[in-house]
Design a protein with these regions (language model features):
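Substrate-recognition element of Asp-dependent hydrolases with the DxDx(T/V) motif
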Residues: 23, 90-120
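Active-site neighborhood of HAD-like aspartate-dependent phosphohydrolases
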Residues: 1-42
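Conserved hydrophobic/aromatic "anchor" residues
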Residues: 6-8, 72, 146
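Generic enzyme active-site microenvironment
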Residues: 5-7, 107, 163
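Metal-dependent phosphoesterase signature
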Residues: 53-92, 100
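Alpha-helical substrate-recognition element adjacent to the catalytic core
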Residues: 29-59, 88
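Asp-based, Mg2+/Mn2+-dependent phosphohydrolase catalytic module
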Residues: 1-2, 38, 98, 112, ...
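Residue-level detector of anion-binding/catalytic polar loops
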Residues: 33, 103, 179
């Protein structure tokens, strides 16, 4: 095992406040009710279109849906770095893995421009491949972004592992035939991850726990 594919939001970066602010900006522009951070936490994971579908009354059936989505994207593109920060220990974790020779990539359902912007700002010295949502590739849980990341890295999927914080990530890894490591510090509770099939020996509660788990998995190959 020499390759680690990471989810972004809720795994490497705490983006929840900026996402909430941009959703609520879009809601206010069109006179719709705003949402709490706790509500937005349950809405995220499937990309901006689904996030706004869950946020706006009547979802995609609302005549204003496309305009609200566009307002969200425009606001978030300008404000995605306002309050977003790496989770404590994540930068050190990536430095450790890079130093051990792992190939690292990010795949996300966040729109591609924001993914690349955030990756470059926070993790550019560790991660060279970052792929987000675009018209060119199916979003997670389809395995397409994972396959693209592996191609861009020049790595074999049989030697890769996927790391994420949600049920979408568990399903993505399954669809890509990769083992999945689930983190408990993100947008889903440990109970939720367990209910979605995350095994105890593939759950980690701190970033510092990833390198030892990867080392153990390598011995099992």
């Amino acid at each position: 095992m020499d390759t680690v594919i990471f989810d972004l939001d809720g795994t490497l970066l705490d983006t929840l406040e900026d996402l909430t602010d941009s959703v609520n900006y879009a809601m206010e522009q069109f006179g719709f009710p705003v949402h709490t951070i706790a509500e937005i936490r349950t809405f995220v994971g499937n990309g901006a279109p689904k996030l706004l579908e869950r946020s706006i009354p009547q979802g995609v059936e609302n005549p204003a849906y496309e305009a609200v989505l566009a307002a969200f994207k425009a606001h978030y593109a300008e404000h995605c770095e306002d309050k977003t920060r790496p989770y404590e220990g994540v930068t050190e974790m990536l430095a450790e893995l890079k130093g051990q020779g792992y190939h690292l990539a990010i795949v996300s359902n966040k729109f591609d421009g924001a993914v690349k912007k955030l990756c470059k700002k926070y993790f550019g010295e560790f991660i060279s491949v970052s792929i987000g949502e675009s018209a060119e590739v199916k979003r997670k849980p389809a395995p397409d972004t994972v396959y693209r990341a592996l191609r861009e890295l020049g790595c074999d999927g049989s030697r890769a592992v996927y790391v994420g914080d949600s049920e979408v990530d568990i399903q993505t890894a399954k669809n890509a035939s990769l083992p999945c490591i689930s983190v408990t510090w993100g947008f889903r509770s440990e109970e939720k991850l367990r209910s979605e099939g995350a095994p105890e020996n593939r759950l980690i509660r701190t970033p510092q726990a990833l390198a030892p788990l990867l080392a153990r998995l390598r011995t099992e190959e």
